[in-house]
């Protein structure tokens, strides 16, 4: 077995974008990772710089613990000439309420007690 294939991770095909459902022209839901054997959705804001044409540099804006998708971040980067995507990785929607198919919350229990559940392949 060649060295390059011995340690090659088995990753999904990242060239395929996740399934997406647009709410309006600046926000969307996209397919998240499977969590506890169920499909999840992620809410995000998206924006393009005014007058963009063709390829555009982009920023992916990931909030810290307890954060959310911040539309202000998207606008700030759009004003600087970047496409921007700000997602809510705590399983919440634009109103801050939990999505019925959102991923794990950002609370203490979800972050730290999940380690006690045991590992699976």
Question: What is the predicted function of each stretch?
Answer:
Residues 71, 75-76, 80-121:
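Cap/lid segment of the alpha/beta-hydrolase catalytic domain
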Residues 1:
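Cytochrome P450 heme-binding "Cys pocket" and the immediately downstream C-terminal segment
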Residues 4-54:
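N-terminal cap/lid segment of alpha/beta-hydrolase-fold proteins
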Residues 35, 64-68, 91-94:
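Solvent-exposed loop/turn segments at secondary-structure junctions
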Residues 43-46, 54-64, 84:
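Short beta-strand element of the alpha/beta-hydrolase
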Residues 40-45, 57, 73, 99:
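Surface-exposed beta-strand edges and their flanking turn/coil or helix-capping segments
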Residues 50-54, 67-68, 75-78:
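Short, charge-rich binding segments
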């Amino acid at each position: 077995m060649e060295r390059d294939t011995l340690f090659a991770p088995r990753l999904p095909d990242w060239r395929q974008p996740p399934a997406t459902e647009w709410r309006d022209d600046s926000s969307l839901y996209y397919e998240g990772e499977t969590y506890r054997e169920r499909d999840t959705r992620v809410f995000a804001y998206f924006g393009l710089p005014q007058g963009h044409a063709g390829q555009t540099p982009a920023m992916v804006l990931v909030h810290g613990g307890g954060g959310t998708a911040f539309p202000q971040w998207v606008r700030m980067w759009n004003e600087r000439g970047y496409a921007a995507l700000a997602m809510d990785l705590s399983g919440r929607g634009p109103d801050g309420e939990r999505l019925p198919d959102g991923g794990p919350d950002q609370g203490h229990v979800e972050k730290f007690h999940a380690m006690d559940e045991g590992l699976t392949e």
